[in-house]
Amino acid sequence: MGLREETAEKHRIAEQKEFNQRMFRGELTKEEYVNYLTQQSLIFNQIEFGNNLPSDSLRRSEKITEDLKELKEQENYIVLPSTIEYVNYISNLTEEQLLPHIYLNYLALAYGGQMMKSKVPGSGRMYDFDNMMECVGSIRAVQKDEWSEEVNKGFDFLIEIFDGLQNTTGPNGK
């Protein structure tokens, strides 16, 4: 089986998390989306800090910062324990070991993010890629089926993050 098939179950679970579903339906408040962006900022800053990406046009940190500046009204942001765990985990990986997490996080923005951009508060700069095909191609060029275990670990972290974000919003998402 290939990478896509080996990670399909975790991908499905992550997509079906209530917070993620609410984001796809355009139901997040500005505060909830800012909390999501805060987690994304920490993850992408760690991935990009001192690491070579398959393409420089993949870089998201500055765009996430622009989104946060646009939406920022609150001073206290939630940083989830699961986000700290994921950031700590990826901080201990070599550049080669980090590639499955680049695959997971950047392709999620490249594909799912294009549907999400019109549903979230603000401009959604995080989802803007200067050359989408080149960005996706740069990841596909280094992609390996052997990444499935590591991609599934990344999904486990993201599933926990989605659960944590949902738990900060209350049982009905408000």
Enumerate the predicted regions with their spans.
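Metal- and O2-centered redox machinery and metal/ROS homeostasis
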Residues: 1-174
